[in-house]
């Protein structure tokens, strides 16, 4: 793949994530995350770390607010490794995600999601 087609494929992977979050569709999320993916980040002062199943469980038991958005802020590719910076709104406040991706065969997979979120004031 060329850099342009790799970037397009990475954006498609992030679209699977975004669509899965918007519609609480775990199958779509599973099209974004490698089966060994991990999560680690902050919501306020609380540190959360878990295997990817933790996100799937959360999505199955929670609803995402109607105003949820997911915007790619940037992508950097180095061979078969990439980093994508993404902003999510109306999930737990304003969240900046750093997705780390690996190209496995011809497919890009998110292998880690690292984030920092300031919680929404209730």
Residue ranges and their predicted role:
Residues 1-27, 31-35, 47-48, 122:
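Short, low-complexity N-terminal intrinsically disordered segments enriched in polar/charged residues
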Residues 5-9, 38-96:
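Surface-exposed, charged secondary-structure patches
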Residues 20, 66-69, 74-78, 109-110, ...:
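Low-complexity, flexible helical/coil segments
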Residues 33, 88-90, 114-115:
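Short beta-strand segments enriched in hydrophobic/aromatic residues
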Residues 94-122:
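Short beta-strand edge/turn micro-motifs at domain boundaries
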């Amino acid at each position: 793949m060329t850099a342009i087609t790799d970037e397009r494929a990475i954006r498609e992977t992030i679209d699977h994530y975004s669509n899965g979050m918007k519609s609480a569709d775990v199958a779509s999320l599973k099209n974004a995350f490698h089966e060994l993916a991990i999560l680690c980040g902050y919501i306020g002062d609380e540190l959360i770390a878990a295997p990817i199943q933790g996100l799937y469980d959360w999505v199955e038991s929670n609803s995402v607010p109607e105003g949820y958005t997911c915007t790619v802020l940037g992508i950097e590719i180095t061979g078969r490794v990439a980093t994508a910076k993404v902003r999510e709104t109306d999930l737990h406040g304003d969240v900046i995600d750093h997705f780390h991706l690996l190209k496995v065969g011809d497919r890009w997979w998110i292998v880690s999601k690292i984030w920092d979120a300031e919680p929404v004031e209730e």
